[in-house]
Amino acid sequence: MPKPPDYSELSDSLTLPVGTGRFSGPLHRAWRMMNFRQRMGWIGVGLYLLASAAAFYYVFEINETYNRLALEHIQQHPEEPLEGTTWTHSLKSRLLSLPFWFWTIIFLIPYLQMFLFLYSCTRADPKTVGYCIIPICLAVICNRHQAFVKASNQISRLQLIDT
């Protein structure tokens, strides 16, 4: 039976054992210590960040198109609406008149919420999953406040008995 390698030094912990055919370093041990939810959380975070990096380039292409369409909209703005315009054309012209930072905020909030949810799945305690999501966070804070008010009301009803 071969003796397992000693990873007490940092330089040894980053090397692969020769001849065993599998990784048995500290990263492998940390991965084995995680439960299934944590592993899937880290995989989800990695895939989410990879998809975000791919979408980042696409967003800047949309930004250039958005700026071009917005400038065309400003330059060709008729004073009164034409008779042949449809509701989709009207909606498109109204949405193009909104600034780009507004659209960025609209898409950034759900993006960050999803990232924080995936990141919370990597935590060891399953009770803390989802606390970073705004509606759940607000519900927890309100519930704590109501519990505090209820407890303080119960304490104020108690009569003080002097002995």
From Swiss-Prot:
Major localisation: Golgi
Q: What is one GO biological process annotated to this record? A: regulation of vesicle-mediated transport
Top-level taxonomic group: Eukaryota
GO CC list: Golgi apparatus; Golgi membrane
Membrane-spanning regions, if any? 40-60, 98-118
Its membrane topology is listed as: Multi-pass membrane protein
Q: Which UniProt keywords apply?
A: Golgi apparatus, Membrane, Transmembrane, Transmembrane helix
A Pfam family found in this protein is TMEM251
Q: Where in the cell is it found?
A: Golgi apparatus membrane
Q: Which family does it belong to?
A: Belongs to the LYSET family.
Subunit structure, as described in the record: Interacts with GNPTAB; this interaction is important for proper localization of GNPTAB in Golgi stacks. Interacts with MBTPS1.
The protein here is known as Lysosomal enzyme trafficking factor
Species of origin = Sus scrofa
